[in-house]
Amino acid sequence: MNSGEISIVFSGGGTGGHIYPAVAVADYLKKRYNNLNIVFIGTNEGLESKIVPQHGYKIEYIQAKGLKRSLTVKNVEVFLKFISGYRQALQILKRIKPKVVFVTGGYVSLPVALAARRLKIKTILHEQNAYPGLANKIISRFCEKILISFEESKRFFKNSNKVVLTGNPVRLEIFSHNERAAKSSLGLEDKIIVLAVGGSRGAENLNKAVIRLSKEFEGCKDVYFILSSGDTKYLEAVNFANSLGVKSNIKILPYISDMPRYLAAADIVISRAGAIAISEITALGKPSIIVPSPYVANNHQEYNAKALEKVGACFVVLESELESDKLKSFLEKLIYDKALYERMSESSKKMGKPEATQNIGKIFEEYLSL
């Protein structure tokens, strides 16, 4: 470490939902300070091993594995890896000597936070979802600050005096397009665009529901569907569309690499309820129909979706309801009821926290100046 250099450690991983917010904060701080040494701690099995280096940051690896919810002998291996990871985190933190540790959840963050506590290093916790994960619940008991993305999260943390509602950081590129230019770039200036996204891996039931929906709206020439099916579900989705004879009013893509442009162009979004998706949709004030995934830990996506629904920022359709008329009914309301559309757009904007990264950056500055 150079003289005058300040080190910060970020840790969180497993999924993009834990990693991208940390990267967004790191990017913000890097622009504000020219004397920062930013280091991530993760596992070489999680997505952080790809995402962090792609963004130009150093990453150090420790051993860690997620706890199995049921009683199983595999948890012995989890415990042994945890002990090993804790010791590795201690060695890394002793060497780097960070002024602050910022953890965003996932099983890798717990040994890092505990090591920071042992070394009396200030720790800031960020929770992206309405329902906190197990690691974050434990870390919240001893960290200095608990930053949340949803007001509803506050009730799950006992130390409410440490809780600050900041929102979930989103990448700056999300704000780089205006709606008219984005629509024009897609050749869809005169269309009501319904963007449907089932996550990076796709969602078979959601894909089929959206394709059936596009078939029912074929007579409505103003409405155009764009479906991001997921790489592994792409051929299946195309074949299903062909079997229904759907062609003219839907574009099926395996993956959307330029999501900021497509999201800007969209009038209505149909999406899962992952933390990043919710944050980006609301940051742009998009009315949405949210279909929470039932295949996630603690059913946290449904908590996220209900938090939006509570303030009128979205409609919620459960996975089990996809074959009902609910999805079609909600879409018709958003297309044909302009007053409802405007109200939901306004509620979405109020729910969104486009300034989340700056909010977190200001809290960091308090600790960096100590």
Curated annotation (Swiss-Prot):
Sample GO molecular function, one term: undecaprenyldiphospho-muramoylpentapeptide beta-N-acetylglucosaminyltransferase activity
Family: Belongs to the glycosyltransferase 28 family. MurG subfamily.
GN (gene name): murG
Alphabetical keyword list: Cell cycle, Cell division, Cell membrane, Cell shape, Cell wall biogenesis/degradation, Glycosyltransferase, Membrane, Peptidoglycan synthesis, Transferase
SUPFAM superfamilies: UDP-Glycosyltransferase/glycogen phosphorylase (SSF53756)
This protein's record includes keyword Cell membrane: yes
Residues that bind UDP-N-acetyl-alpha-D-glucosamine: T15, G16, G17, N129, R171, S200, I256, Q301
Subcellular compartments: Cell membrane
HAMAP family in alphabetical order: MurG (MF_00033)
Protein name: UDP-N-acetylglucosamine--N-acetylmuramyl-(pentapeptide) pyrophosphoryl-undecaprenol N-acetylglucosamine transferase
The keyword Cell membrane is annotated on this UniProt entry: yes
A Gene Ontology biological process term: carbohydrate metabolic process
E.C. number(s) listed in UniProt: 2.4.1.227
Pathway assigned in UniProt: Cell wall biogenesis; peptidoglycan biosynthesis
